[in-house]
Structure formats: structure tokens, C-alpha cells
């Protein structure tokens, strides 16, 4: 190892270690704030959100308190006083904002946004599965490794297990807590990239937008929160013309504070992601860690983020080659020095891109290896239809900057800032590449509809809004600074701008419960795992699940995780960790499970003419046969309401009913038990 290598390794270790230490401290603060807040909310019997405005009012009060903490932190930073207290206030303020914005409206229910309906059902099922055991197992099917990334759910399962909670019951506090942690981690990352007072403001803006538009899908919202600073970090890792020995263009020049007040408040401004002493390798490691995290949490956002980072790498390589050519042009009074082919200038950013990919792949392998290995050796027909969904939002380009709203105005400011500062701001370049990547992905998603699939571009609204809102926050601050200078630095101007910013933020923040009203209402109208509705109205059929669970365990004599149940009421599997013979729809089914083949087999079973024939068919099943059937009862028949993919239609699912004659189970090999509207049929060994 050379002296130069040692000189870079030590700062790298110091920077990474310091960043990790600060991130751990911030995460602990977020966990404490979220835990204290959620416990405090649970101590009072609140009225339901959908029948009273009490929780909405208290949410607004809590948001004002959180905003006050953030303002206090910014004031301390600008006055260069009590930096540790300022950091603590900023972490607590962001975590409190997340906790009160989501936790207070949901205070009277045990369910998270959207209850256990639609997509939230399979997410709850996944968390229940990984609460029951840390082993990587499919959410529904026995003996198959999971296809959907298990990272967020695995951590949640371990949290639920430590707390002694059922998976469904831990979903809400874990989702809110994980979002609080992600928000403060984004703040920590921003403070490593830009001046601290700006970092607090930018994080607050992107967090508010993420809560409004990404929070129902909590595990993806974690990536949305981290995406903006991660892209800036990635650009700092890949585009380092000075560090690579080339002539720096304007885009690589630091962006220092320009006013006297800013110079006093911030002694130095970060113009690149990592100080040059580390050679950008700290940013490389950080970017790889982010992409690895995305790979273990949410495949779609991994794809988009990796696409954006790849575009950055190619752009950085192009700029490096161009800069190398410029250095070889003869100038008056200077000689041209040949240093080898100009294409070699592209190697440093491409090498860094490769290292980022390797780091991400190593992390992704933790959750992806089992299913990839199984796919390589399995002969089961692939049946995944996860990409078969094209709502109207996926057939149009999202243009939030043209909407007449507070968020639309912020996105418009962000769009203008991205264009104006594209040649002079590394932040604008990084965020701009991210926005460009999303629009290119959206167009590609529309294009591949001709091939019978999509790239689910409709789910990119949240990251797009987060990026544009982040850019809008920068645009607002820099625009206000420019106006301040143009007006000869009037005495009260900055105070007026700050007041307008705070009022605008509060106006948007207090509207978040309204934006999430359908999701919050569903959390109160769905029947939870205790068989109750939080709005105190009569519960649905799920109130019989506890009795069904008891009968199942008594009649089979096996643990839940060793029992396979065929049922169309898959919410039962979300509350109890039984394996299912068939998933809710093919879109959530593991491709290794052969959803279509199982559906055809179920129909064949229903058409058999005797119990003996059914017993024989179950014994010959190519998959592990059901140990129990959970039907809806309809006269002398037992029914299952199943689903099939009808893409490209919207809705993309058609429900159909399969009926089993009750006489088909009139045999000592089967035990039938009527429980409420259900009939439970267990199969004797």
C-alpha cells in the first residue's frame, strides 16, 4: 500500500465511521421519539378518525410543535450555538413530525393505513410470516423461498418478536417507527452534503411529501425518503473532475455562501459529496449501501435508483473524456502534454460505478440468493404477473409542477431551479438526473405495454414528488437569497421569508391527514386480528378467525407454520402464520408457485364426484396438498372466490367462484366444522 493510499484510507475510515456513528445516534433518537409518542397516543381512548375531528386537531398541534423544534434547530445552527443541541432538536423534530402526522390519526386503531385491505393484506401476511420465524420463507406458499425482498419485513418481524407482538399488530408501530428512522437518516446524510440549516429545511420538505404520498407503502417510503440525498451522494462519488486530475468545470466548483450572514453561519459549504482527501470513496461506499438497502426493500425503486446512478456514471465518464480533450488543446504560451488515450479519463467514474454495483450486489445477495438459486434449478413454470397493471396514471406522464396547488407551486419552483442551476450546481445535476431517470422509466413503461407488460411507472409518483419538492426547497431558499441581495439586504426580509416558508409548510402538513383520509378510514373500518373494528361498529367475518384458528390447531394437531390451508379469505393468513395453498391474486404470488396451475387444479378438485376421488387427487397433488379448507358456506355447497389476471384490462383482476359440493367431504377422512359464515374442513392424516 502506497503512502497516497494510506492517506486516503484513513480519511475514508474516519468519514464512514463518523457518519455511521451519527446515523446510529440519530436513529436511536427517532426510535425513542416514535416509541414515546405511540405509547402516549395509545393511553387515551380516542374517537375514530372517520367520525370525529379530534385526532385531526391534535395532529395539527403536534405538527406545530415539531415545526417549532426544527425552527429552533435552524436558529441555533445559524447562530453557531450548541451544535449538539441543534442536532438533537433536528432529529427529534423530524421524528416527532412523522410520528404525530401518522400516529395521531391512527391512534384509535391497531391497524396501519389501509388496514388489511387490498395490497396491505399481503404486506401484513409477509410481516406475520417473518414474525413467526426469521427464516426466509414465502409469505404464502410452503417450501418456496420468498420472491419479494424481505428486508423491511424481516427487520419488522424481529422487532415484533422481541416486543412479543403479533405481526399484524406490530405493523402500525413498526411502519411509523421505520419512517421516523428513515427521515432522520436522510437528515444526517443531507448534513454531510450541504450546510446544516439547509439540510433541516430540505429534509422537512421531502419528509412531508413522502408522508402524504408514499406512507401507505411504508417499506417503499423508506427508499423515497433516502433517495434525494443518496442521488446527490452518488453524483459526488462519480463526477469528481478535480480528484481525477482533470480541469474542473463550473459544475464541480463548490457553492459557497454568498452573503455576510451566511458566511458567519457556515464556515464552509460542501460542494462535493465527500471531502477530496477521501477521493470520493466514502460516497462510493454510501451509494452502494443505499442501493443494497433498496435491493432488500423494494425491487422497483432499486431499478429506478440503479438506472439513475448508471446514467450518472455514463454522464460522468463522458464529461471526464471531454475535459481530457480540452486539456490537450494547445493554448497560447503552453505546451500540450500527452498522457495517453483520452478514453482512459472515463475509467475512474466507471470503476467507481462498478464498485457501487458490487457493494449493492453483495447486500442484495442476502435476500435474493435463495430465490435465484431455486429459479435456476426449478422446472416449475413461471407464473408471475407482478408487472401486469396499467392504471390511467401509468399511461400518462406525471406533471405535478403544472397542478394548481401548494405542492404544484413547490414542484414548479423545483423544476425552474433544476433548469437554471443545471450547469452550476452539483445538487441540481444530481436531482435532475434522478427526475430524468423517472421520466425515461415512465416512457419505457408505456412502450413495453406493446410487449404485454409494464414497468409499473404509476408507482413512481412518490419519488418524483420527493425529488421535485427537494429541488423546490433549494429553489425557494436560493431564490429568496437572490431577492435579498437584489433588494440590498433589507433588515426584515429574511424573517418575512422564514415566516412564509413556515406557514406554507404547516398548510401542507396539516392537509396530509386529508390526503390520506381513505387509507386512514379503512384502518378504522377493517376488522383487526382481535376481531374488532376500531370505529366500534359491528365487525366483519374476520371476527370468527380466532375461533377458526383454535379449531384448526385442535383438529390438525400441528403448529400453524406446518399447516397448509386452502382459502379465498386470505386475510386469515395475514393474522395467523398458516401457509396458503393459493395466493390472493397472481400479482402477489411467487412466480415459482405456478399460480395458474394451482388454480386449474382447484377447479378440477371441485368437479370430482366422490370423497374417494378427492382423497386420491389430494395425494397426487404436485404441490403440498392442503391440510385444511376454509370455505364460505352457501347452502349445500362450499365456495371459494378466486381471482385471475385479465391484464391489460383495468381493473386487472377478475373474481370468480369455485363451488365444492358439501357431499364431497362426507367421509371419515374429512372433519367439517361450521363457524359463522365459514366451513372449516380439515384433512385427517
Task: Report the location of each language-model feature.
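Start-transfer (signal-anchor) and selected internal transmembrane alpha helices
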Residues: 1-33, 40-107
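Membrane-helix boundary/interfacial segments in multi-pass membrane proteins
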Residues: 48-59, 112, 164, 212-222, ...
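Membrane-interface junctions at the ends of membrane-embedded or membrane-associated helices
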Residues: 76-80, 236-283, 315-348, 469-495
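Internal/C-terminal transmembrane anchor helices
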Residues: 87-99, 356-360, 364, 489-515
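Membrane-embedded helix bundles of polyisoprenyl
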Residues: 94-101, 179-318
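Active-site lumenal/periplasmic loops and adjacent helix-entry segments of GT-C-fold
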Residues: 101-224, 534
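Transmembrane catalytic cores of multi-pass membrane glycosyltransferases
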Residues: 112, 119, 218-223, 292-432
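Short periplasmic/luminal acceptor-recognition loop of GT-C membrane glycosyltransferases, typified by
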Residues: 504-606, 617-648, 668-683
